[in-house]
């Protein structure tokens, strides 16, 4: 009986000594098979010519949606002189637009997050030693963003700037003047539609979900396009999930096999939901827009405070056939 008990315990815990190795493998996912699959997909993307839109080259390794594929396609199309990136709002950097770029293409970069726990987590990973990565802990504001960028000591023309802070994105991007990225990736809020120049009002300590519904944040695609046009960029489209917009510096547009598009042409309504009813059931289609009805926004054309007109946005998206469900 005792012998059987010993055998049972031994079999039950025979892998206990391997736990450190398993944890190490999971943590160091730059060695994982998904990276190898991403490398194969990236190689295939090099031969994709005459694509109709960015969705044709999407694939996901570490990005939240298909942005890894879009980025790989763009850096193969464009003669980017400085292989550098800046991304903020990365949390622990496990899911990010530039992580695969860092690992696969050996770019150098700066990542910024407002949580010291997240930044310490990044610095504890082997990729922080194996690759040229800087991680800075700071809650980004209009007054500190340029100094944070300057501290990275990159040339003014960096390769990619990725802006995703779930809130003051428009105001922070507007403030940045220390770098001129070849590619700008900026999160937009599709619930504002494509016609309205809307953004949330700037607030230094804005935290998504604190004062308003979780789905009320960021800016409209129209506002992001207007802002980047003034900075010398052309809009080439959005990812198919409907949360990231892509802008290319005008000097580099000629190298692309796809054209600049209008807000209406490039707009994508978000496929995911970040809005719920009182019972916690996810809202879909037009109900996501109605969840932010009459909330205060800034019209980036006039600078005036307006109120979200959900029905006007819904009507324009229906007319343009931009919604899969109503």
Q: What is each residue range found by the language model?
A:
Residues 7-43:
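N-terminal auxiliary segments of SAM/dcSAM-dependent transferases
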Residues 28-79, 83-86, 94, 148-149, ...:
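Rossmann-like AdoMet/SAM-dependent catalytic core
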Residues 55-163, 190-193, 276-281, 285-288:
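SAM cofactor-binding core of SAM-dependent methyltransferases
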Residues 104-105, 179-180, 231:
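Short, structured coil segments at secondary-structure junctions
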Residues 127-130, 152, 179, 202-204, ...:
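Short, hinge-like loop/turn segments at secondary-structure boundaries
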Residues 160, 183-185, 244-248:
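Conserved hydrophobic/aromatic beta-strand scaffold that supports enzyme active sites
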Residues 167-180:
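A short, conserved alpha-helix within the catalytic core of class I
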Residues 181-192:
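Conserved beta-strand signature within the Rossmann-like core of class I S-adenosyl-L-methionine
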């Amino acid at each position: 009986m005792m012998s059987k008990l010993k055998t049972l315990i031994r079999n039950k815990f025979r892998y206990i000594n391997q736990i450190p190795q398993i944890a190490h493998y999971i943590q160091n996912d730059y060695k994982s098979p998904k990276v190898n699959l991403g490398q194969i997909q990236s190689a295939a993307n090099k031969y994709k010519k005459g694509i109709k839109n960015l969705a044709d080259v999407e694939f996901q390794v570490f990005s939240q949606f298909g942005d890894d594929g879009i980025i790989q396609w763009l850096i193969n199309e464009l003669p980017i002189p400085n292989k550098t990136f800046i991304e903020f709002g990365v949390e622990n950097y496990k899911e990010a637009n530039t992580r695969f770029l860092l690992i696969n293409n050996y770019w150098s970069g700066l990542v910024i997050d407002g949580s010291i726990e997240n930044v310490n987590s990044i610095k504890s990973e082997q990729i922080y030693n194996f690759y040229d990565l800087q991680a800075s802990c700071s809650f980004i504001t209009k007054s500190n963003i340029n100094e944070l960028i300057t501290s990275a000591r990159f040339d003014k023309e960096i390769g990619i700037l990725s802006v995703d802070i779930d809130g003051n994105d428009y105001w922070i991007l507007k403030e940045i003047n220390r770098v001129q990225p070849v590619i700008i990736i900026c999160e937009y809020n599709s619930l504002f539609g494509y016609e309205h120049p809307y953004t949330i009002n700037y607030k230094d300590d804005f935290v998504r979900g604190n004062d308003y519904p979780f789905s009320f944040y960021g800016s409209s695609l129209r506002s992001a396009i207007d802002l980047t046009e003034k900075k010398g960029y052309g809009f080439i489209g959005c990812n198919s999930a409907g949360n990231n917009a892509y802008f290319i510096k005008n000097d580099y547009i000629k190298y692309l096999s796809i054209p600049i598009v209008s807000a209406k042409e490039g707009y994508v309504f978000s496929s995911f939901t970040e809005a719920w009813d009182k019972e916690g059931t996810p809202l879909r289609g037009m109900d996501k827009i109605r969840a932010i009805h009459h909330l205060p926004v800034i019209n980036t054309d006039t600078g005036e405070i307006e109120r979200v007109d959900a029905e006007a946005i819904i009507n324009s998206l229906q007319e343009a056939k931009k919604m899969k469900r109503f």
